[in-house]
């Protein structure tokens, strides 16, 4: 899988993951059930249909997930977001700032963004499309995945009132 800008993996259940960081951006989508995380000292409960973005500097601890707790982890290299960033334009907002900070390797924003969007059908559909597209090899896969992520960002920008972020980084 070396060289891939985005990968998808199922979340490992029944195991405690002590505090750690990643050299990539992690996006966790909770398909069913829930998982409990401590991110940069903040307790985060990720519920079914919710989305959690973690930057490269986020310190994450994960408590064991149960049998019915199913999550998908997107492992994303920062350059994957180049196209998506063009789609969301130049307007300043917390999501754009988060992505730009990830691209620059800076930690000016919080280490995570938690979107409580379980009842937002377009977001759920785009996440399902992204998982399907990554899992199933097809022509134009990279462009499709990057455009889908851009559409996901645009939808999330319409629901910033459902986003929570950690206390780290600068506040706007």
Question: Where on the chain are the PLM-derived regions?
Answer:
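A hydrophobic/aromatic-rich effector-binding and dimerization subdomain
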Residues: 1-5, 65-132
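Tight coil/turn sites that cap or link beta-strands
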Residues: 11-14, 48-49, 57, 79
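Short histidine-centered beta-strand/loop micro-motifs
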Residues: 15-22, 62-65, 85, 141
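Short, Lys/Arg-enriched, Trp-marked, Pro/Gly-tolerant hinge/linker segments that flank
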Residues: 112-117, 134-147, 154-172
């Amino acid at each position: 899988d070396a060289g891939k800008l985005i990968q998808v993996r199922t979340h490992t259940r029944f195991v405690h993951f002590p505090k750690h960081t990643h050299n990539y951006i992690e996006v966790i989508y909770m398909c069913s059930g829930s998982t409990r995380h401590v991110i940069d000292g903040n307790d985060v409960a990720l519920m079914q249909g919710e989305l959690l973005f973690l930057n490269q500097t986020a310190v994450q601890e994960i408590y064991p997930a149960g049998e019915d707790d199913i999550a998908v982890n997107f492992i994303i290299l920062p350059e994957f977001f180049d196209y998506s960033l063009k789609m969301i334009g130049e307007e300043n907002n917390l999501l754009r700032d988060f992505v730009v900070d990830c691209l620059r390797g800076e930690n000016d924003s919080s280490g995570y963004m938690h979107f409580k969007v379980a009842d937002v059908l377009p977001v759920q559909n785009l996440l399902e499309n992204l998982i399907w597209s990554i899992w199933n090899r097809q022509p134009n896969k990279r462009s499709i995945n990057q455009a889908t992520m851009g559409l996901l960002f645009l939808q999330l920008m319409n629901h910033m009132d459902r986003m929570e972020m950690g206390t780290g980084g600068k506040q706007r």
